[in-house]
């Protein structure tokens, strides 16, 4: 009986390296990212035993309470990215400032959320590690620490996410598609599957925090009222988990602006999700899967020029017919 040899993630990347003229530097960078994800998953699985599930007792730059796993995941990713020696600068949700690494010899900027949905950790529910990668301009000298890293999503060459601890992760490569991998426990052997959003509206799902419906704008509330019965409703409460479902079933994930809250301090007219390491990441993956993403002005997410490294945005991401409909609504 012939032996079946599973494909390794490195084999997959090498095939694409040859086909799309990618360099070995990218392979080294991706190896550091997948190693970081493995370490995060290990700490997640053993968190209760090692006392890593509580609060860290600090507040991050977003004004959010930090959990111990947030700090652990951030430290892990920063360590492996620095060890790769291929990264110029890093923007992390958990780091107030830009993190300099190899400004002279590095080739990539990396944007990441080390532990999306960390409030799920204590309940054993899925969390995510999201990342986006942009390449240094070949003719570029560093303009300065405050602007060179501020790249549009259209400048990204890759983006991906790990859904921890499911053993599944997604990687989108520019002009080469969006791929989901089912990995073994070592994340060495993988089963790649190209993701394309389904065309059948009967499969589509609608995902958003329904508890906030009354504080959305009138336009958004009206659209929900008309369309909520057309699609199945699913909401996990972690961007990585909800977007993972979206890639499988199609439809729409949205995080609208909050503009009608009884307490004006709770309003978020600019949106909640961060552009560089959340919205751009899922927008990039969705585009490579045949979808699109916009903000609440109808502007494509990947065309937004960031003004700051923790800039927030509204987000509507999913199947193109729905996104086109919403873009027309917002621009009207």
UniProtKB/Swiss-Prot annotation:
Its main location: cytoplasm. Mg(2+) 1 binds at residues 93, 113, 115. Its EC number is 3.1.3.11. It is found in: Cytoplasm. Mg(2+) 2 binds at residues 113, 116, 278. One of its GO terms (biological process) is fructose 1,6-bisphosphate metabolic process. Binds 2 magnesium ions per subunit. One of its GO terms (molecular function) is magnesium ion binding. It holds the Pfam family FBPase_C. Substrate binds at residues 116-119, 209, 235, 272. GO terms for cellular component: cytoplasm. Belongs to the FBPase class 1 family. HAMAP family: FBPase_class1 (MF_01855). Homotetramer. This is Fructose-1,6-bisphosphatase class 1. It comes from Syntrophus aciditrophicus (strain SB). The gene is fbp.
């Amino acid at each position: 009986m012939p032996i079946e040899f599973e494909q390794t993630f490195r084999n997959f990347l090498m095939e694409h390296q040859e086909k799309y003229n990618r360099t070995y530097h990218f392979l080294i960078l991706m190896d550091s990212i997948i190693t970081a994800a493995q370490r995060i998953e290990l700490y997640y699985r053993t968190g209760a035993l090692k006392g890593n599930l509580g609060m860290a007792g600090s507040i991050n730059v977003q004004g959010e309470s930090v959990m111990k796993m947030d700090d652990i995941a951030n430290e892990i990713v920063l360590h492996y990215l620095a060890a790769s020696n291929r990264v110029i600068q890093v923007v992390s949700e958990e780091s107030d400032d830009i993190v300099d690494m190899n400004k002279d010899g590095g080739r990539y900027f990396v944007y990441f959320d080390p532990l999306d949905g960390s409030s799920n950790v204590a309940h054993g529910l899925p969390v995510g590690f999201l990342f986006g990668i942009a390449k240094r301009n070949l003719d570029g000298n560093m303009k300065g620490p405050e602007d060179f890293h501020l790249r549009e999503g259209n400048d990204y060459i890759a983006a991906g996410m790990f859904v921890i601890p499911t053993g599944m992760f997604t990687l989108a490569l520019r002009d080469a598609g969006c791929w989901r991998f089912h990995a073994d426990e070592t994340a060495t052997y993988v089963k790649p599957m190209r993701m394309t959003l389904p065309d059948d509206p009967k499969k589509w799902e609608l995902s958003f925090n329904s508890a906030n419906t009354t504080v959305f704008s009138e336009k958004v509330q009206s659209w929900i009222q008309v369309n909520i019965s057309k699609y199945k409703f699913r909401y996990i409460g972690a961007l990585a988990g909800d977007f993972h479902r979206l890639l499988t079933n199609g439809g729409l994930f949205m995080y609208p602006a909050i503009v009608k809250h009884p307490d004006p301090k709770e309003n978020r007219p600019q949106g909640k999700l961060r552009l560089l390491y959340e919205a751009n990441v899922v927008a990039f993956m969705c585009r490579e899967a045949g979808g699109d993403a916009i903000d609440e002005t109808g502007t494509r997410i990947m065309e937004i020029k960031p003004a700051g490294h923790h800039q927030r945005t509204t987000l509507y991401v999913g199947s193109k017919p729905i996104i086109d409909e919403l873009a027309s609504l917002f621009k009207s």
